[in-house]
Amino acid sequence: HKATPDSSTTLSTVEHLDRILGDFFAKARRLDIFDLIDFIVLSDHGMATYYPENYVNLNDYLPRDSFDYVFDGVPTLLYPKPTYTDSAYAILKCVPHVTVWRKNEIPEKFVYGKNPRIGDLFVLPDIGTYLQFRPESRPIFAATHGYDNFAPEMEAIFYAAGPSFKQNVELPVMANVNLYLIIARLLDLQPAPNDGDSVVVSTLFR
């Protein structure tokens, strides 16, 4: 969070990690069991540069005492008092750099389902915007995550190699929920019901 994705700090960190991985694999290749080991290198999410001029504090638009609970950040879930839901929705529709949905209108791509704990209003900031609902000062960081999971900036990395995996297979994109299925298969475990795609996962394995 302290550096933007395209900063010299991030570049030097990636180069440092690359050297560490190079040393790791060089030593791993000396092992008699190297050809039996599966390796996975991954990240949990992408990062996007935060632009302070796009900062949005919902405290400037909505009365705090009209909500029973607020889970703020990227995204923000609002739990307004029943008599205030419609008013809050109308106000949020006019706030720049954010999109708001009622609970029953949240796009399926976010996979929120119908859980009763979901806030009555789901507020998602644009890429590069940070959202808060609190009186204190603005956040101090250079980048963050949690935006639309279909945005390229939010894509993670995934590399796999070893006897279990096919060679030279490249997927255009893969949901991180598939990691559970991948690891379960490597460990020969029966996965519990989940949101992963077994068809996509099968394309990676021999």
Which sequence ranges carry the predicted segments?
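Histidine-centered active-site/metal-ligand motif
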Residues: 1-3, 45, 144-148
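Active-site His/acidic residue clusters
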Residues: 1-19, 23
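Metal-dependent active-site segment of extracytoplasmic phospho-/sulfohydrolases and closely related
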Residues: 16-57
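Active-site neighborhoods of enzymes that stabilize oxyanions during catalysis
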Residues: 70-170, 174-182
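Short catalytic/ligand-binding loop motif for oxyanion handling, primarily in non-cytosolic enzymes
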Residues: 1, 48-51, 131-133
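…; additionally, a secondary subgroup of soluble metalloenzymes is captured
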Residues: 178, 182-206
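Sec-exported extracytoplasmic/periplasmic mature domains
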Residues: 22, 26-33, 93, 97, ...
